[in-house]
Amino acid sequence: MSQSAVSFQISPVSKTQDPLIQQKIDLKTKPPGALGQLESLALQIARVQATDSQQTDQPQNTVLKIVHPTMLVFAGDHGIAAEGVSIAPSEVTRQMVQNFAHGGAAINVFCRQVGFTLEVIDCGILTPVEGVEGIIDQRLGAGTGAIHLEPAMALETVDKGFAMARDLIERHHQAGCNLVAFGEMGIGNTSAAAAIMAAIMQLDVIDCVGRGTGINSETLERKLMLIELALLLHQSALTGPKSVLACLGGFEIVQMTGAMLAAAERKMLVVVDGFIATAAALVAVQIAPNVRDYLIFAHQSDEQGHQRMLEFLQAKPLLSLGLRLGEGTGAALALPLIQASVNFYNQMASFSDAGIEAVV
């Protein structure tokens, strides 16, 4: 049975109340703009939550909320990894998924610190982890095809992944969650992300490919060559964002893309992590441009090409820490800043409240 096409209906955020929202921000006890990027972030969050059909208050009375923040880490293996494009073999994907389940990875530590609930989704690692609680089975296969030799997956598999991702997001939405963050694990997935970037942005491969988690120059040359071969092989088939995912993507990238679209459809805030998650966001924006209104970009990673992709998406990340780990670590570290934006909007006194002469 073929998988029916999955579509998303995403409303743009309403900007009709921007003057009132901005006025509330400007009348806090500070010079205008003194909280920098936190102010533009508060405006974005207020727009999203004002767009929610359940929100009826005027901006001056609105209380912004972050409810049940959830980190979703999607894992999948890549056929191209067999060619040695990473510092680690594919087996490490499975080992790290086990590490996530046991609470021992960086993402576990950071989620515990900042208050994220963490879920790990097996989208298609080579060998499933059995007998370990805390891993959600949304497998689309046992690793993708090697993209320099064949498509990563069938087009129908992309839609199947989107449907699974929508169901996952719906479960969290029904539980009251209004902010989801996205991380990933998959040896070889920087190759897939770079190929997606090159295809969508029409760039030379050398402008998109980096050292991932730390490959040497010889491995980098091999990685460049294989991605160039992949783009040449699939050139005629790259007719739209879904075909880009089918030819060049990963099971985890597909489900991240679908989950971003589904979360925006439900008017949830979406926190995007690093290079691979941003590649998923790049595809999501091609599918439904309105999704961009809901995306918060956590950080600029140390991966070659990430800055260029962020600029293409007109995104200003919250952090720049030289991270190149993935897992959602940058997105986790951004949560306190997001909460700070919400808190100053809700709790900071206005000039009139404090009896201070306005400096607006």
From Swiss-Prot:
GO terms for biological process: cobalamin biosynthetic process. InterPro entries: Nict_dMeBzImd_PRibTrfase, Nict_dMeBzImd_PRibTrfase_bact, Nict_dMeBzImd_PRibTrfase_N, Nict_dMeBzImd_PRibTrfase_sf. GO terms for molecular function: nicotinate-nucleotide-dimethylbenzimidazole phosphoribosyltransferase activity. Its EC number is 2.4.2.21. Pathway: Nucleoside biosynthesis; alpha-ribazole biosynthesis; alpha-ribazole from 5,6-dimethylbenzimidazole: step 1/2. Belongs to the CobT family. This is Nicotinate-nucleotide--dimethylbenzimidazole phosphoribosyltransferase. It comes from Shewanella baltica (strain OS223). The lineage of its organism: Bacteria, Pseudomonadati, Pseudomonadota, Gammaproteobacteria, Alteromonadales. The gene is cobT.
